[in-house]
Amino acid sequence: MGDPGPEIIESVPPAGPEASESTTDENEDDIQFVSEGPLRPVLEYIDLVSSDDEEPSTSHSDENFKCKDYIDHQKDKVALTLARLARHVEVEKQQKEEKNRAFREKIDFQHAHGLQELEFIQGHSETEAARQCVDQWLKMPGLRTNAANSGTKRSFQRGGRMWRSEKPILCPIMHCNKEFDNGHLLLGHLKRFDHSPCDPTITLHGPLANSFACAVCYEHFVTQQQYKDHLLSRTAAADGHSNSLLPQIIQCYACPQCFLLFSTKDECLKHMSTKNHFHQSFKLSDNKGTARPISFPSFAKKRLVSLCKDVPFQVKCVACHQTLRSHMELTAHFRVRCQNAGPVAIAEKSITQVAKEFIVRGYCSDCNQVFMDVASTQSHKNSGHKITLANSVEESVLLYCHISEGSRPPCDLHLFSQPKISSLKRILSVKESSAEDCIVPTKKVNLGVESLGGATRVQRQSPAVTAWFCECRRQFPSEEAVEKHVFSANTMCYKCVVCGKVCEDSGVMRLHMSRFHGGAHLNNFLFWCRTCKKELVKKDAIMAHITEFHSGHRYFYEMDEVEEEEEEAMPSSSVESHLNTDKPPSPIAVVDHCPANSPPRGRWQCRICEDMFESQECVKQHCMSLTSHRFHRYSCAHCRKTFHKVETLYRHCQDEHDSEIMMKYFCGLCDLIFNKEEEFLSHYKEHHSIDYVFVSEKTKTSIKTEGDFKIVETSSLLSCGCHESYMCKINRKEDYDRCLPVLLEKGRLWFRCSSCSATAQNVTDINTHVCQVHRKEKSEEEQQYVIKCGICTKAFQNTESAQQHFHRKHAALQKPTATPGGANRSSTCQLAASASHAEKNLKQPSSQKHSDVEKGAEHDVRCQNIEEEVELPDVDYLRTMTHIVFVDFDNWSNFFGHLPGHLNQGTFIWGFQGGNTNWKPPLSCKVYNYLSRIGCFFLHPRCSKRKDAADFAICMHAGRLDEQLPKQIPFTILSGDQGFLELENQFKKTQRPAHILNPHHLEGDMMCALLNSISDTTKECDSDDSSGMKGSPAEELRATEDVELEEAIRRSLEEM
């Protein structure tokens, strides 16, 4: 309230005892109010008491008035709020009653309409009746195919109308012409990158209405019963009609000029009128009438769609005509390079060109011949045969479908003629098998080779088991195993079309597509031959490529192997073929099936990537192409950083150098920098395009003297391809030179800078780093880098020491050839026992005692630290995971049995066992089977018989992965040992989120929830479940996260 003013204050008598005395002396009628200023409304008043006994209390009465006024105001406010809420509830109740009433009316209407339709379709077939019901339902008021009804209040607008979507969105790629109802569908289409202009179904919407056509007289019928009546009436005419003549089901209509498909004839006519497509692309008669929609049978529609899908297409830039192979590449191109241009889709054929296959001029049913032109039709008609003619495109399509469905494949038309692609499986003929005195195999597909010799000699005994053999004579227990071996031996893998990464497992590739490319590219990968650098789309095509261009592992076959001779024949043959895997097959083991076409004794090798080629032309083309080798080609003139792609250089200059682009050309093979692209290309052509050599094969089929005999190493092969011990220094140098780049490429060995934490996979990169970054610190007297082991991270001063360390400590023996029976495997060290058995059969005389002693010593160590034939999980594959769990099966062997459900996707389980524990996989556990099937479980080879061997292995591999994996991937160790707490403290120093869980203190559901919460990036701690558990793992986990948070805050404050 405002200030009452001086005039009102003056009229108030003073307070206190003096005021009371003066008030009693004066008369009430003598009181006057004097005002000097302008009149104002009276804001306060004085309660005048008539009684002399009562004392006026101005302040007390004013306080009571204010309090009463405030309470009344609050009461009125509450009353208004309650009234407003009551009205709101009443309105909602009325709306709900209206919705319920409308829903009941709709249900009653549908029920009545359904009863009416059931009476109408009693005489129709089930399929036709169901289709009519769907058509009638779509015509009803209410739900629509182009309307959105989410069940919320937005669906019901004023007047009970339903919200409808806006105008369909057109794909921004030119010539794609696909439309979508909303942006989400368009985004999925863009990610799938299916912009083929040769797609006749883009205008095919809604249900397909069936009608029936006669393939003899080309008449159309609405129902199937009318067609049957037509056949009964025309059977006696003997003009081709018969009771067995199947009708052609008309499901859609095609535009006569562009052959786009439409659900109804009205839609097709509307399209023809809009596009002015009243001209026929194929004229089969002189009739000059107006073109009309072509009735397209179901068989022709499926055939046209299938042929159009096989038509390759490309998406190119309108400005620079660069081919764009993915949505990611397209987006990056138009963001960096051609910002004012657009993409266009180009197909090798148009729909009209594909539809030309349906054009047939005549058909003779007597001799089953098809005629494609008028001359051949008339010539054959003169012979007296009755020919069915097609005078329009519609009649030609009906005749085509009648011929194709009547005889597959047709004799002359070859409608389904596809390239004869051979399978990898062969079937031996009876003549060949009898000539070799062996049992006739059950399967063998002929690939154009007339004779197949060298089959395994097996006597006709029983019982027999089925086995699969590769061309290299290795035996496998299943067809999947031998096919996987053929793919691996021929360097076949899968290549991602989006980013170009390669992988040997299709499951890993699909996981890569799902994780890194949004899930829309699950099938957007190709088959890639690393030897020939060739991309093929289909699996059958890659098989044909293996058969034509490769040798040694081109096929496999199936045979009935005698069970009795398995123990005698298989160990020696398996070891022999095992030792000769990387060498040309012996003439005793495998006979050359095509000696006339056999390649020369030698191959060409590229010195840059060490890939081998069959001819000089192939290796020359490989070296001439800049895309064959991946190296840095561009350099920033500001900071001398190098890049693979020019787009990356542009982004670098925009971010780091204020969009000032200064580019130079850099040769990553020899570290030279050029100012112009012509100089770089000239340098590459002169020096690197001819960097290949011819590698001759020393082995010969006929050996005349002992001097011509090459020393054959008889020791066992290691997992890297080298031998366990060598008798010849030349063989050792060759194998080590071949093995070292492979170890560096796979990350088994790597270079580490001595001055900083930089790493590299080859000498060139580490030397470049030392020269550019540590120019001032470089000294010729001391080495600026060390070579570290990728498994135990031990450092060495030279590559030879590091390679020898890897062979001694981490290279396991290769697994011998798989046999169905698996004889002589009683030892717990299966691989070492099998390898020693092979050495026993193939060992040379006792002149090699020194090598035997060395081999025996290494063999004893390997029996304790043996790694099976499988390699450790690939680091690139582990980078795709969201959680790495190390399980100590010595402490908790029933890990999978305690899990109540599946773990989150991206959780990788790495199991360890040691001591006397003999952990067996729970084959009946669904969680274990699922993780094994998707490749998210790996059982580490038995460490040793020491009690703490598994703990040491966990620490070693966890430390190795901590250096190689991104820091956001958490590690969890499931073990009851308290020694891992120190490992957790070490991980804190490296900023790695790590958790140590004791499985003995956790229930299965609690542990599963903890593991899933760790892998979830948006996890929140469940404080309710763990509030009463004092000292529980959940509290330890929460405390650990608090400590990490405090440490991060402290570190950030120090930096500030």
UniProtKB/Swiss-Prot annotation:
Annotated region (Important for interaction with SUMO1 and SUMO2), positions in chain: 1-344
Modified residues (Omega-N-methylarginine): 158
Post-translational modification: Sumoylated. Predominantly sumoylated on the N-terminal region that is important for interaction with SUMO1 and SUMO2. Sumoylation is important for localization in nuclear granules; desumoylation leads to diffuse nucleoplasmic location. Autosumoylated (in vitro). Sumoylation enhances E3 SUMO-protein ligase activity.
Region called Important for interaction with SMAD4, residue ranges: 168-521
Intrachain S-S bonds: none
Covalent cross-link Glycyl lysine isopeptide (Lys-Gly) (interchain with G-Cter in SUMO1) as placed by the record, residue numbers: 704
Motif mapping: PLRP: 38-41
Region Disordered: start-end pairs: 1-39, 806-830, 839-858, 1019-1045
Chain segments carrying region Interaction with SUMO2 2: 42-50
SMART domains in alphabetical order: ZnF_C2H2
Compartments where located: Nucleus; Nucleus, PML body; Nucleus, Nucleoplasm
UniProt entry keywords in alphabetical sequence: DNA-binding, Isopeptide bond, Metal-binding, Methylation, Nucleus, Phosphoprotein, Repeat, Transcription, Transcription regulation, Transferase, Ubl conjugation, Ubl conjugation pathway, Zinc, Zinc-finger
EC numbers: 2.3.2.-
GO-annotated molecular function: DNA binding; SUMO ligase activity; transcription corepressor activity; transcription regulator inhibitor activity; zinc ion binding
One GO cellular component term: PML body
Entry-annotated residues carrying Phosphoserine: 155, 429
Domain notes: Binds UBE2I/UBC9 and two SUMO2 molecules via its N-terminus. The most N-terminal region interacts with the SUMO2 chain that is covalently bound to the UBE2I/UBC9 active site, while the second region interacts with another SUMO2 that is non-covalently associated with the same UBE2I/UBC9 chain.
Record's function text: E3 SUMO-protein ligase; has a preference for SUMO2 and SUMO3 and facilitates UBE2I/UBC9-mediated sumoylation of target proteins. Plays a role in protein SUMO2 modification in response to stress caused by DNA damage and by proteasome inhibitors (in vitro). Required for MCM4 sumoylation. Has no activity with SUMO1. Preferentially transfers an additional SUMO2 chain onto the SUMO2 consensus site 'Lys-11'. Negatively regulates transcriptional activation mediated by the SMAD4 complex in response to TGF-beta signaling. Inhibits EP300-mediated acetylation of histone H3 at 'Lys-9'.
The protein's name in its UniProt record: E3 SUMO-protein ligase ZNF451
The organism of origin for this protein: Mus musculus (Mouse)
